């Protein structure tokens, strides 16, 4: 992996109806209905809104057999109206419902935490190695039964692990760890590989973006060790709504997309499902438009470990670096910034105010001014660019800020 230059990870291709995923295909975007799956017309109308917004896939939950069976009516009505976007059934707890859905829709998502294992009860279970192997045999037998149906009906499968619903069996052996999350997925993946079933998509989701990122990276490494390159679905659970939901999704999904990881995404917001699509599109375009950028000749930090998120050690400058909490710098020149309206803990650590008079701004935060107008005074610091870099030796300040773009440093 190149840590400095964007390259999308090369995955295998998964066939999902008329819209294949992975390989050289674009990053696909999807959303999920929040209507009752037993009610055909509301599901159809909402699905159409999602599709018209630009979704490549529409996912619907199927809690029971009746809901799974009604997917046929929903699909039929969508086709009648000229919509042939692949549908995905979301299944929990009941493998029999997954069997039913696999005969109808183009893709079925199952949760390894409750597909065969009982629902999580937070009870610690003790297994000998032989007993644990027997549990894997049960899982394998039932999963193969499901895969045979998928093969017959050309149905794709997403193995979708949720951090919050790992089985008691996995939790008892691996604990609440990224390693346990990954193993929950790998148990099913190994069966897919043995059975030569390749229309598979994987996902690891968590409401904690740090856990999500680390677990997905670990999954990629584990797959590479075992000769697998299945495509990835990215998403953050319980992202929320408004600005918070968008920021959380950008942190979790965006970080992995920047790594080149991800073949389909869903931005999960507590809003109308169709509102998720433009957010997802903007996020994907922001990352993928950087493909083919001017090469960056970076040097990897010697102690950097892709699978361990440890903060880089740095020198302390004022209240920045070392063990200090990362500081925030806000641009007071932006049109939508209301300095007077910001109160209390919402204040940034620093305001950038350009060439303006620092005394015209509240002293509740430090102020950063352009170096060519800097005058020494408490809580005010200079900012240097390539044009003003020559002033660095002559200006005395406890902290000096430098602003350069990568091409300017090369």
Regions found by a protein language model. Give the residues of each.
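N-terminal amphipathic alpha-helix/helix-capping segment at the start of soluble metabolic enzymes
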Residues: 1-32, 147, 151-153, 289-338
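Active-site mouth loops of central-metabolism enzymes
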Residues: 23-42, 61, 85-94, 169-182, ...
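Hydrophobic faces of well-ordered beta-strands that scaffold small-molecule active sites
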Residues: 27-33, 58-60, 85-91, 108-110, ...
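Glycine-rich, proline-tolerant flexible connector loops at the mouths of alpha/beta enzymes
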Residues: 34, 54-78, 112-134, 200-209, ...
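N-terminal active-site wall of soluble small-molecule enzyme domains
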Residues: 62-104, 335-340, 356-362, 371-377, ...
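Alpha-helix-loop-beta-strand connector modules within alpha/beta enzyme cores
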Residues: 65-89, 137-154, 219-228, 289, ...
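Hydrophobic or amphipathic alpha-helical targeting/insertion segments
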Residues: 84-123, 129-149, 154
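Catalytic alpha/beta core domains of metabolic enzymes, predominantly
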Residues: 126-140, 170-321, 389-390, 395-410
